[in-house]
Amino acid sequence: MKNTLFCLLAASFAASASLCADAPTVCSAGGKDDMVPGAPPAAQAPATAAPAASRFIYGTPGEEYPPYGELPKELWPFANTEPYYRYFVTRMPFRGPGRDYAPESDLRSLKIGLVDAPKVGPNWERSVRTREGIVLAIEEANIERRPGELPFDLIEHEGIAQWGGAANLAALLADEKVLGYLGTIDGTDAHVALRVTLKTEIVMVNTSDPDQTLTETQIPWLIRVLPDHRQEEGRLAELMVRKCGCTRIAVLRTGDRFARVGAHQFADFARRLGSPVVQELLFSPGATDISYQIAAIKESQPDAIFFLGEPTDIGRFAKQFREAGIKARFFGTDLLMEDGFLKNAGDAAEGTTFTFYSDPDRQDPLWTEFRARFKNRWGHEPDAYAAYAYDGAEILLHAMRIAGPNRWRIRDEVYNLDYYQGVTGWMRFDGTGSNTAPVRIVRYEAGRRVFEPQGEFAPPTTTGKLTSSP
């Protein structure tokens, strides 16, 4: 049935598409045309690491998924009893009209939206790297398009540094007739934009917000390709309590949504494992004097400190903690992979343990080929933001190839995805549309990031599910 539907959709798309000789306009972050290092990949051969069809595995309507991010049962709410009803084990269906709507007669490109971060704060630099991954994916897709297929066009808007601004941008993208969009990094912006997405019915692929409550809204126009807080904080809680034997855990965090949601999730996990957090303190981003926090944490005598905040701040604080004689182990999330932490922490980084998504030095062909193409295009190595943005764009581009210029059918292709093999590895989507692939444990040793040995995640070999082809 799935393959029959694909053939009908592909035939409909081919009949409605017209060849457009004009190159798509791709704007830089901030809306200005951009000259960047390297050349667009016009002469590069497409990746040959794996056939595209084998990288997409789809589910079936009404299918049940393991609850709560596929975490160990001891971390579930109501783990010791069977509740009357468990939410988030099936995907919310879309029962509205639209799948049979005809495309516009004057369609000259397939538009993809992107909501950047505002040009303030550290998220701007992450947004630039996100954009680089998306632009590369679109450039490659335009090179590989077949005769009669429309080009892809990136419609981009800089974020607004005001609460609620993302709603206006999501509405603007709808007015500009995008078929799907990517973004945003900030969790508050993502939540606000998603509410508009429910009304405009344009699928959103989030590539960088780990807030687990984003997909728990059960709005069936969203998937997230980045593993969420449950994967990171759940893994860290198990590591601290079960493997390291920590019984007195303190938390030092910022007051933003990223840290607030992450700390709440971690505290829940630690409590369920029998080691409630003994202290939770806040700091202001950019602060240099945290003498109050140091004194309070020192008095609580923790054997572990979990940091949530910007890596430059955490690096500076780690150094101050060691100078104050605090010997507790340091733990953190993926942000500690950034160079700012090691630069500010110096020797105090030794032994700091954190979670990350995959080893950048692994030899997976999809990753190594992407890494080379990205460096050739942009002049530097890709980070996690660029890689997940590339994967998110690839999922959306694939759906648009299959479904054609119909955003309701594009939604079906995106939202029904169970497994996807991207440059970041295999993804596994749960009943809310969130990637639940396991994360890695990393430790700083002698100034180097050392990844704990762990097998690469892959889907079961006999899923019995269908794949589609581009």
Spans of features found by a protein language model:
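Positively charged n-region of N-terminal signal peptides that target proteins for export
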Residues: 1-4
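Extracytosolic ligand-binding ectodomains
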Residues: 6-10, 17-470
